[in-house]
Amino acid sequence: MTSAEQLKKEFQIEGITETSVLRYFETLNAGEFEATAALFAVDGVMRPPFESDIVGRDAIAVYLKQECQNIKAYPNTGIAEALENATIQVQVTGKAQTSWCSVNVLWLFILNEQRQISYTKIKLLASPQELLSLRREK
């Protein structure tokens, strides 16, 4: 069995076959944040909830190491569609779990023609009151 076949067997998201998106969740949940960041284009952008854009693989890796140590993502279903310039938009819904809460999430990915993540936005799907209770104090 090839590693791609093994990945598909172990980590599936209904409607999604893009390896970079599957690997994003696999490496994120394994705490392999350097590997997660390596899935991004050199100038890739991550937009986490309550944060400004984080630009570049190094900055994304630093952010993930600081903020995602105890978070598990449970993607459920997704859809992919071709955009202009050979890019692909992938939307995935699921849950994110911390030690103290679980929240519904929408992950939006834009993949470039090399199938690297050029942009991802993580959007919490919760009521305004739920979101206020989740916001970290700075």
Question: Can you say where each PLM-predicted feature lies in the sequence?
Answer:
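A short gly/proline-enriched turn/hairpin at secondary-structure junctions
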Residues: 7, 45-54, 67-70
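A beta-strand edge to alpha-helix "cap/lid" segment located at domain peripheries
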Residues: 2-9, 61-138
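Hydrophobic pocket/interface hotspot
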Residues: 24, 36-37, 44, 56, ...
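Generic alpha-helical structural signal
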Residues: 18, 22, 58-61, 65
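Short glycine/serine/threonine-biased micro-segments
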Residues: 29, 54, 92
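Short, low-complexity N-terminal intrinsically disordered segments enriched in polar/charged residues
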Residues: 1-30, 34, 38, 137-138
